[in-house]
């Protein structure tokens, strides 16, 4: 069984036991989070939401909070001696999907 959930402005396909990296959530490591924005549930029977599946939830355990690798952002305007170099590390949350209730 799998589901498509909406979190952090993105739609993510998840299965039970899977480890996923999502946009940062306000939860500590070891806590359990529940997603109620379930857009689709697949498996033996298919349920499509309009826009979400009524009564469907996905439960996950927070493994850790972290920051992704650094990317370099560079702005440059030719002939004007204008440039700006900046680094950015996006925060993320690592989850393990425990249960899909449909």
UniProtKB/Swiss-Prot annotation:
Say if the entry is tagged with keyword Amino-acid biosynthesis: no
What SUPFAM superfamilies has UniProt attached to this entry?
Answer: L21p-like
Identify the GO cellular component terms for this protein.
cytoplasm; ribonucleoprotein complex; ribosome
- Classification via InterPro entries: bL21-like (IPR028909), bL21-like_sf (IPR036164), Ribosomal_bL21 (IPR001787), Ribosomal_bL21_CS (IPR018258)
Superkingdom of origin organism = Bacteria
Tagged with keyword Magnesium: no
GO terms, molecular function: rRNA binding; structural constituent of ribosome
A Gene Ontology biological process in which this protein takes part is:
translation
Per UniProt, the keywords (alphabetical) are: Ribonucleoprotein, Ribosomal protein, RNA-binding, rRNA-binding
Q: What does this protein do?
A: This protein binds to 23S rRNA in the presence of protein L20.
Subunit composition and interactions: Part of the 50S ribosomal subunit. Contacts protein L20.
PANTHER family, per the entry? 50S RIBOSOMAL PROTEIN L21, LARGE RIBOSOMAL SUBUNIT PROTEIN BL21M
Record-stated family: Belongs to the bacterial ribosomal protein bL21 family.
Q: Would you tell me the protein name for this molecule?
A: Large ribosomal subunit protein bL21
Q: Which organism is it from?
A: Bacillus velezensis (strain DSM 23117 / BGSC 10A6 / LMG 26770 / FZB42) (Bacillus amyloliquefaciens subsp. plantarum)
């Amino acid at each position: 069984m799998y589901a498509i959930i909406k979190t952090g402005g993105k739609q993510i396909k998840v299965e039970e036991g899977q480890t996923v990296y999502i946009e940062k959530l306000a939860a500590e490591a070891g806590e359990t989070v529940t997603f109620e924005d379930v857009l689709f549930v697949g498996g033996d029977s298919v349920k499509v939401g309009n826009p979400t599946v009524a009564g469907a939830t996905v439960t996950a355990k927070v493994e850790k909070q972290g920051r992704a690798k650094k990317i370099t952002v560079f702005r440059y305007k030719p002939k004007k001696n204008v440039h700006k170099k900046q680094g950015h590390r996006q925060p993320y949350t690592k989850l393990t999907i425990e249960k899909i209730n449909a």
